UniProtKB/Swiss-Prot annotation:
One of its GO terms (molecular function) is rRNA binding. The lineage of its organism: Bacteria, Bacillati, Bacillota, Bacilli, Lactobacillales. GO terms for cellular component: ribonucleoprotein complex; ribosome. InterPro entries: Ribosomal_uS11 (IPR001971), Ribosomal_uS11_bac-type (IPR019981), Ribosomal_uS11_CS (IPR018102), Ribosomal_uS11_sf (IPR036967). PANTHER family: 40S RIBOSOMAL PROTEIN S14/30S RIBOSOMAL PROTEIN S11. This is Small ribosomal subunit protein uS11. Located on the platform of the 30S subunit, it bridges several disparate RNA helices of the 16S rRNA. Forms part of the Shine-Dalgarno cleft in the 70S ribosome. Belongs to the universal ribosomal protein uS11 family. One of its GO terms (biological process) is translation. It comes from Leuconostoc mesenteroides subsp. mesenteroides (strain ATCC 8293 / DSM 20343 / BCRC 11652 / CCM 1803 / JCM 6124 / NCDO 523 / NBRC 100496 / NCIMB 8023 / NCTC 12954 / NRRL B-1118 / 37Y). Keywords: Ribonucleoprotein, Ribosomal protein, RNA-binding, rRNA-binding. The keyword Ribosomal protein applies. Part of the 30S ribosomal subunit. Interacts with proteins S7 and S18. Binds to IF-3.
Amino acid sequence: MAGRTTRKRRVKKNIESGVAHIHSTFNNTIVMITDAQGNAVAWSSAGALGFKGSRKSTPFAAQMAAEAAAKSAMEINMRTVAVTVKGPGSGRESAIRALAAAGLEVTSIKDVTPVPHNGSRPPKRRRV
């Protein structure tokens, strides 16, 4: 007699405010929306949306990633976000604008890009 497999039902969360972490590198932009404790609620990236190669690093790809993450965060009734931006990429500003345009109220913007106090040696200069 085969036992029935019970699936865990997904509990519908109701989170009013959260934190939008935008990680913008030279190659990609990742947008992750978490609750106040840091548990991931929604995420998206330029690569996950189907952008490949150098198109991932464009501001338009970052805008689309932020819109997708905001849309799935608004499904659980999220209204306000505090934005933290990390990295030197080109999609920083467009991702913040896309979050606001999607209907999320941006309460604060914080730059948390790590700056070394003369840490490890950087990679050699590119000769193109």
